[in-house]
């Protein structure tokens, strides 16, 4: 890597983009400092000196949000950053996906990409700056990488597409799209949308790709200027004679028939047995520990299985479970299967099954998101769990990993556009999707199960959502798009393209690929095929439950809304929160107060809500001119008496208004503690209340 500082500048969506090399982190294989507006990200790429054993490419992408970047001190006892939050994890996955396919096949060195956000301007996306930084760090390093790539955000406002919309623009945008790719094709898409059409989504993707091409050209100019020397990487060549011998044995022992097994577990068992039989042919009795040969045979067998699966799909249009390319697995769904929960939905598609369970809470049960931007109160959450038993395996039980966080967030993104506004449904909603069985497309099963749970719970959603995962097998001169992919097709195919939406349009998409990129033709066809599949699944779901229930569960909390004048909020809260805590302690309710004076009262028992409402009404009650009250004498002065109309509100009863008869002293007719009926005659501009008993005598 060059040790001399170099600075390169361009413009990106109306803001300055600067890439600096040669000054920071010089012991990394590659490092760049990206400045986008006031956002600053340090991106580094480091590779191990020796390759790792195994069949996978050990790439790790990290994205770290430093709280000082936004002028904040971390919360908690230690006052320092802990493990990455969900948003940071999702960004790391977002960067990983377009980069991973562009390393040479067979490259097994550990590669670690680190992105540190040093300064954060919410209007200049740190996430997209980190994606460009990751691409540049790899491109200027000696690590073999077939980039560069770039990524952009795309918004859609009033029929117009916008590159890298600001925070304010995102609030009104119908689309929140992240798209990445290289000069020739798109290789990553992720989006949340408010029911936009397939054509609108397609146009958005390739509108973004036009900007990506310009950014890739800019990066290539930097690479050409720096001229990094890349590591020499020579892939390991297979022994062709050995490959032919193994291939002959697979044909002899019926690889095609073994692959074409409907049941996943039976297929896996049959493949394991076939591999074991073939490997036994190569075990030398005099050298039973010939591990290198055995390892090579297993690697060849795995490649031959992959080739056979792809050949069957591409040439014979037959999938491992016997389906046609556009055929969906058998569907089954139920609702209301858990009696004490607030809502539940069980969705099964072939050998993939998700149980989604919904819980309603008060608005105060929101999740507080404290990241680099302003604090956010999230009142809809979707969490995804993938236990080992879902794939018939054992293993340690750990906290949710990157995959679980990513799938949960995708489901949340797909559903959040149909969640009713607070004014219409004043609840916090949490859905947990438990994957009970998995053979591919479990994230989309969780979306379908969650829609069923929402309707079972009586949440007045705007429209039901269904999800489906599309696959792809490419040949040199042809391709086959698959509807509703299973696990083997995901692992051995070229694409996992998830699409969720209503009958009217798309609410979320996510695309991962293992090839260099996708053409417009493939993406357009995949979107249309996904639409047809989504509608088929939707029709099945609506046969189970066609609209939200009209009543909530008996075990769900009840929430009542009332409104007070904003200047009365302080009276309800009291000094140091004393009054509101007294209400909560006495009634057991949950209270949430908005700045406009809206109060949400939540509890399981309606009587508790009624009591809390009575207390608040008493606190915020106001005197009205012309109304009569049974008042209590609280203080006596020479000129009259101060009487309490109700808690928190006193009035002056002037000596001349006590009686129609002349009174020399107030004490002659009133003493502290007496009750007297009064009528309100005046409330002045300062809110002072004047009362009269005399008016009632006349």
Curated annotation (Swiss-Prot):
CDD domains: KH-I_PNPase, RNase_PH_PNPase_1, RNase_PH_PNPase_2, S1_PNPase
Binding site for Mg(2+): 490, 496
GO cellular component, as recorded: cytosol
Domain KH: 557-616
A GO molecular-function annotation: magnesium ion binding
Annotated function: Involved in mRNA degradation. Catalyzes the phosphorolysis of single-stranded polyribonucleotides processively in the 3'- to 5'-direction.
Keyword Transferase applies: yes
Location in the cell: Cytoplasm
Biological process annotations from GO: mRNA catabolic process; RNA processing
Keywords from the UniProt entry: Cytoplasm, Magnesium, Metal-binding, Nucleotidyltransferase, RNA-binding, Transferase
InterPro entries: ExoRNase_PH_dom1, ExoRNase_PH_dom2, ExoRNase_PH_dom2_sf, KH_dom, KH_dom_type_1, KH_dom_type_1_sf, NA-bd_OB-fold, PNPase
UniProt cross-references to Gene3D superfamilies, sorted A to Z: GHMP Kinase, N-terminal domain, K Homology domain, type 1, Nucleic acid-binding proteins
Substrates-to-products reaction catalysed: RNA(n+1) + phosphate = RNA(n) + a ribonucleoside 5'-diphosphate
Family per similarity comment: Belongs to the polyribonucleotide nucleotidyltransferase family.
Signal peptide segment: none
Cofactor entry: Mg(2+)
Name of the top EC class for this enzyme: transferase
Protein name from the UniProt record: Polyribonucleotide nucleotidyltransferase
């Amino acid at each position: 890597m060059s040790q001399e500082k170099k600075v390169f500048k361009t413009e990106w969506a109306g803001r300055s983009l600067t890439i600096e090399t040669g000054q920071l982190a010089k012991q990394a294989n590659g490092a760049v400092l990206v400045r986008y507006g006031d956002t600053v990200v340090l991106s580094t790429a480091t590779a191990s000196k020796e390759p790792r054993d195994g069949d996978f490419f050990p790439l790790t992408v990290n994205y770290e949000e430093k709280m000082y970047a936004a002028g904040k001190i971390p919360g908690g006892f230690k006052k320092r950053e802990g493990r990455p939050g969900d948003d940071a994890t999702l960004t790391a996955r977002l960067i990983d996906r377009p980069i991973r396919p562009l390393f040479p096949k067979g490259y097994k060195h550990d590669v670690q990409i680190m992105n540190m956000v040093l300064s954060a301007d919410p209007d200049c996306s740190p996430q997209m700056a980190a994606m460009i930084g990751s691409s540049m760090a790899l491109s200027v390093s000696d690590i073999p990488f077939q980039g560069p790539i770039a990524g952009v955000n795309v918004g859609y406002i009033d029929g117009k597409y916008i590159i890298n919309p600001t925070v304010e623009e995102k609030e009104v945008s119908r689309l929140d799209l992240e798209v990445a790719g290289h000069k020739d094709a798109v290789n990553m898409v992720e989006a949340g949308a408010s029911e936009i059409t397939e054509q609108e989504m397609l146009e958005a993707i390739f509108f973004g790709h036009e900007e990506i091409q310009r950014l890739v050209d800019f990066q290539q100019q930097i690479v050409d200027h720096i001229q990094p020397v890349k590591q020499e990487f020579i892939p390991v060549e297979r022994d062709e004679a050995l490959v032919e011998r193994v291939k002959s044995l697979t044909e002899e022992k019926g690889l095609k028939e073994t692959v074409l097994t409907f049941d996943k577990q039976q297929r896996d068992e049959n493949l394991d047995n076939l591999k074991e039989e073939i490997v036994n042919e190569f075990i030398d009795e005099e050298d039973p520990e010939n591990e290198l040969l055995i390892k090579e045979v297993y690697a060849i067998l795995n490649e031959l299985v992959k080739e056979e699966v792809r050949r069957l799909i591409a040439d014979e249009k037959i999938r491992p479970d016997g389906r046609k390319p556009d055929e969906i697995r058998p569907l089954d769904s139920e609702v209301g299967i858990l009696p004490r929960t607030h809502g539940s939905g069980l969705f099964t598609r072939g050998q993939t099954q998700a149980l989604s369970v919904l819980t309603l809470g008060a608005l105060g049960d929101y999740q507080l998101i404290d990241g680099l931007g302003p604090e956010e109160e999230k009142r809809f959450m979707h969490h995804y769990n993938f236990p080992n038993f879902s794939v018939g395996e054992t293993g340690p039980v750990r906290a949710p990993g990157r995959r679980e966080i990513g799938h949960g967030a995708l489901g949340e993104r797909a559903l959040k556009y149909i969640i009713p506004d607070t004014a219409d449904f004043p609840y916090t909603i949490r859905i947990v999707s438990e994957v009970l069985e998995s053979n591919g497309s479990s994230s989309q099963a969780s979306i379908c199960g969650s829609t069923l749970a929402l309707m079972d719970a009586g949440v007045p959603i705007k429209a039901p959502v269904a999800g489906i995962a599309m696959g792809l097998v490419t040949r040199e001169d042809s391709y086959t798009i698959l509807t509703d992919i299973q696990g083997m097709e995901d692992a051995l195919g070229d694409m996992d393209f998830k699409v969720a939406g209503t009958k009217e349009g798309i609410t979320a998409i996510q695309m991962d690929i293992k090839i260099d990129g996708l053409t417009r033709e493939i993406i357009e066809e995949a979107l249309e095929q996904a639409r047809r599949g989504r509608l088929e699944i939707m029709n099945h779901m609506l046969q189970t439950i066609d609209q939200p229930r009209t009543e909530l569960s008996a075990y769900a909390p009840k929430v009542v809304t009332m409104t007070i004048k904003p200047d009365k909020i302080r009276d309800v809260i009291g000094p140091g929160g004393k009054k509101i805590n007294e209400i909560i302690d006495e009634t057991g309710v949950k209270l949430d107060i908005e700045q406009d004076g809206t109060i949400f009262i939540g509890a399981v028992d309606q009587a508790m809500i009624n009591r809390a409402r009575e207390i608040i009404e008493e606190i915020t009650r106001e005197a009205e001119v012309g109304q009569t009250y049974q008042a209590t004498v609280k203080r006596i002065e020479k000129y009259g008496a101060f009487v309490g109309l109700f808690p928190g509100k006193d009035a002056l009863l002037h000596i001349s208004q006590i009686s129609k008869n002349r009174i020399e002293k107030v004490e002659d007719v009133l003493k502290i503690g007496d009750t007297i009926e009064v009528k309100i005659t005046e409330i002045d501009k300062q809110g002072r209340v004047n009362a009269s008993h005399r008016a009632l005598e006349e």
